[in-house]
């Protein structure tokens, strides 16, 4: 008998390993693996819960019914949405011009009927029984590109063979990605003309690598050189699965192809617009308001059908038919609550008191005449006085270091003389530097660096009691757990805004009525069969400037508002600073240009930390690495919605500052501004410490006695009593202090945004995102490269 054991052969298949991870998949992984298929367990779960046995044939029938239901829904969407597929052509790098690309595309089939409108180039393709409308915006005009993308079903990129993008192309892609992209098709003109197969594959892989780097599409690239390539491209544009933007799925919209105006009977300065185009998106509701970018919200009187200018088949013309008409239930144009001047029974100030309050007060050195005082730049004093009126001002005006001599020598006169010497040196510095240096930006860099080294630290004023200077501040035992009443000491502007009792429930109710599901709308909602038809929308009481702007640009996209979206409230947006912006952005001195969904407006924002909790710390400067929340007065916008944040420089150009999305509409968000007062340990006796330079009189020490002290090394303590009359105080800590420690005291005050919301009309505020000379040089380089 052999003593050796059995050994499996080399062709023996090993046993299957135990899949321990199989039962630990997440719901997302299971959904991805199923790819839309409904499992038997999911279908029979309700049957098992009611103790009803389901046969195998019944389960198969349920799966078949689910498939048929999905196919019927898809056919219904295709049947009712008979508007032409809207495609935006965007050329990147040294690629083909969109006009030349469309000329070649139109010659691939003799049956294509090409028509033109002021904003589109339309193809009627009998071979595919479909229509395609092309938009060719100027890529140097960001507003035109964004408008085209918001209205498009497909975005077609024309990539260069070198796969190299200019700096402007990369910035444009960043802006477009942040604003949201529809279905993407990537085309490479000239790819089919490369005869060498290896070189052709290298070019293809290089372009696909660039596309994957931008995380835009994994469908590969398509050539567009031969007739076969162009036919295949048209088929792809027509039959590819369209993934609508959230903006398109929620809001009815129209790309205006014709605009006419008639005078309003009520007001001669107003007109009634007749906007013609295809009805896109969910079913239109004549009771909802409509938004004209840059001009505001307006009411619709009626919607009627019109003759299609780009028909697939010629048919006898039909008369106009009213398909929706506004009634008494239509949305109001009220944006804010009207304040009652007598509300609260507050006595109105007299004219003498108003004049006295308007007088400008300045602190000047002793002996200064009134004529000299008129020339003193009082930025620091004005900032200090206005800080209690405008809560978003900075607290770092007095950053002079106190001399560590006898206490009696630290007088306000010494500080003022020191400030005078600083002003003289600054004047000499101004004379010596180059005029091209922006002194305001240099000052921002300095303040940002100081804030990074000593966050929120402010020197206690010597010539003013600290209890007066920081009278609107309070101490907190714990920033995380201490309570703060959100309805306490609200500004007057809070009486003008709207607030939801339950934001989530209101949003759920509004979203449930999208697409003609509102049973109370009556004749104001169009029938599903009219979705996608060419129609005329009549808009009432529109300013004449809208017509003038359209004549210049020939570019207008209309969006219908959801209920409540015309009302003003507090809008919170989660943003992240863009790497291309290297300038320090202060939270109080910069007015931003926001692109929120289809809205464009200007406003000052309060920047705060994006952290969990019910209280959030004010960010004095826009963070570079982490996300933050910008809070502004703005119309209500239901999340999710994309946000682009720009700033306007001294030359009138717009620079991308940050990108993000809408967080919520919540006026109860508590943003606290922290001010840190610091002192120096004068004498240390184990846990007992005498601290100086935090306060300069006995009354201030008694006033801030309840506030807890701490040190950067983590020690905690309290003020025990004042020592003398010049600001020394005896403190006690939980452990012994180090001689290099500083003693800190935190004070907090709630801040609110400033009500300065205004519509941003790019037609009235012409600005380029880059200098025109640079754009022309790029165009010349492209033309030379194409000729070579």
Swiss-Prot record:
SMART domains, alphabetized: AARP2CN, DUF663
Residue ranges of every copy of the Bms1-type G domain listed in the record: 83-243
GO cellular component: nucleolus
Main location group: nucleus
Top-level taxon in the UniProt lineage: Eukaryota
Assigned protein family: Belongs to the TRAFAC class translation factor GTPase superfamily. Bms1-like GTPase family. TSR1 subfamily.
Name assigned to this protein: Pre-rRNA-processing protein TSR1 homolog
Source species: Caenorhabditis briggsae
């Amino acid at each position: 008998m052999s003593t050796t054991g059995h050994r499996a052969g080399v062709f023996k298949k090993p046993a299957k390993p135990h899949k321990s991870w199989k039962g630990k998949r997440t719901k997302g992984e299971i959904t991805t693996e199923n790819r839309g298929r409904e499992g038997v367990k999911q279908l029979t779960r309700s049957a098992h819960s009611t103790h009803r046995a389901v046969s195998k044939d019944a389960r198969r029938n349920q799966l078949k019914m689910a498939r048929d239901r999905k196919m019927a829904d898809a056919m219904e969407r295709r049947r009712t949405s008979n508007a032409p597929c809207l495609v935006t052509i965007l050329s990147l790098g040294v690629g083909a011009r969109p006009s030349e690309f469309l000329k070649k595309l139109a010659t691939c089939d003799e049956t294509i009927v090409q028509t033109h409108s002021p904003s589109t180039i339309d193809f009627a393709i009998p071979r595919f029984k479909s229509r395609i409308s092309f938009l060719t915006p100027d890529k140097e005009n960001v507003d035109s590109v964004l408008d085209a993308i918001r209205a498009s079903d497909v975005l077609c990129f024309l990539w260069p063979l070198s796969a190299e993008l200019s700096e402007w192309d990369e910035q444009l892609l960043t802006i477009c990605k942040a604003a949201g992209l529809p279905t993407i098709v990537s085309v490479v003109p000239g790819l089919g003309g490369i005869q060498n197969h290896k070189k052709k594959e290298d070019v293809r892989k290089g372009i696909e690598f660039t596309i994957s780097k931008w995380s835009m599409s994994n469908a590969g690239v398509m050539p567009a050189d031969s007739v076969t390539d162009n036919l295949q491209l048209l088929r792809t544009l027509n039959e590819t699965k369209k993934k609508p933007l959230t903006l398109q799925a929620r809001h009815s919209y129209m790309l205006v192809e014709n605009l006419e105006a008639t005078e309003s009977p009520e007001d001669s300065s107003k007109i009634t617009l007749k906007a013609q185009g295809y009805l896109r998106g969910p079913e239109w509701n004549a009771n909802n308001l409509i938004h004209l970018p840059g001009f505001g919200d307006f009411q619709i009187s009626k919607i009627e059908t019109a003759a299609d200018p780009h028909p697939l088949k010629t048919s006898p013309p039909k008369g106009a038919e009213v398909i929706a008409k506004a009634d008494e239930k239509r949305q109001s144009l009220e944006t804010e609550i009207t304040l009652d001047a007598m509300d609260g029974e507050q006595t109105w100030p007299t004219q003498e008191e108003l004049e006295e309050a308007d007088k400008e007060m300045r602190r000047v050195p002793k002996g200064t005449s009134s004529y000299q005082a008129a020339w003193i730049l009082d930025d620091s004093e004005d900032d200090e006085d206005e800080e209690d009126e405008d809560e978003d001002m900075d607290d770092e005006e007095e950053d002079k270091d106190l001399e560590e001599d006898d206490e009696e020598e630290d007088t306000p006169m010494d500080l003022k003389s020191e400030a005078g010497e600083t002003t003289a040196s600054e004047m000499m510095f101004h004379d010596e530097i180059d005029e091209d240096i922006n002194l305001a930006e240099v000052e921002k860099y300095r303040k940002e660096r100081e804030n990074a080294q000593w966050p929120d630290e402010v020197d206690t004023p010597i010539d003013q009691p600290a209890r007066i200077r920081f009278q609107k501040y309070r101490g907190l035992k714990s920033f995380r757990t201490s309570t703060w009443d959100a309805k306490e000491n609200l500004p007057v502007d809070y009486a003008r805004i709207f607030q939801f009792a339950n934001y989530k429930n209101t949003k759920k109710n509004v979203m449930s009525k999208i697409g003609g599901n509102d049973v109370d709308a009556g004749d104001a909602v169009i029938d599903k069969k009219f979705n996608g038809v060419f129609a005329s929308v009549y808009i009432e009481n529109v300013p004449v400037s809208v017509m003038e702007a359209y004549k210049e640009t020939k570019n207008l996209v209309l969006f219908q508002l959801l209920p409540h979206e015309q009302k003003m409230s507090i809008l919170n947006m989660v943003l992240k600073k863009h790497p291309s912006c290297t300038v320090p952005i202060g939270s109080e001195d910069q007015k931003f240009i926001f692109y929120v969904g289809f809205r464009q407006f200007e406003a000052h924002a309060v920047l705060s930390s994006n952290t969990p909790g019910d209280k959030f710390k004010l960010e004095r400067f826009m963070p570079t690495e982490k996300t933050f929340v910008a809070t502004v007065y703005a119309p209500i916008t239901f999340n999710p919605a994309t946000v682009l944040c720009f700033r306007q420089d001294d030359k009138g150009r717009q620079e991308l500052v940050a990108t993000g999305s809408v967080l919520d509409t919540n006026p109860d968000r508590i943003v606290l501004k922290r001010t840190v007062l610091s002192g120096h340990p004068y004498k240390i006796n184990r846990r007992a410490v005498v601290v100086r330079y935090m306060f300069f009189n006995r009354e201030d020490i008694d006033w801030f006695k309840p506030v807890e002290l701490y040190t950067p090394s983590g020690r905690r303590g309290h003020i025990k009593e004042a020592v003398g009359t010049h600001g020394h105080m005896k403190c006690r800590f939980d452990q012994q202090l180090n001689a290099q420690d500083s003693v800190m005291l935190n004070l907090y005050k709630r801040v609110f945004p400033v009500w300065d919301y205004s519509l941003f009309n790019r037609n009235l505020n012409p600005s380029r995102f880059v200098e025109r000379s640079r754009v022309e040089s790029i165009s010349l380089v492209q033309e030379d490269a194409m000729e070579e």
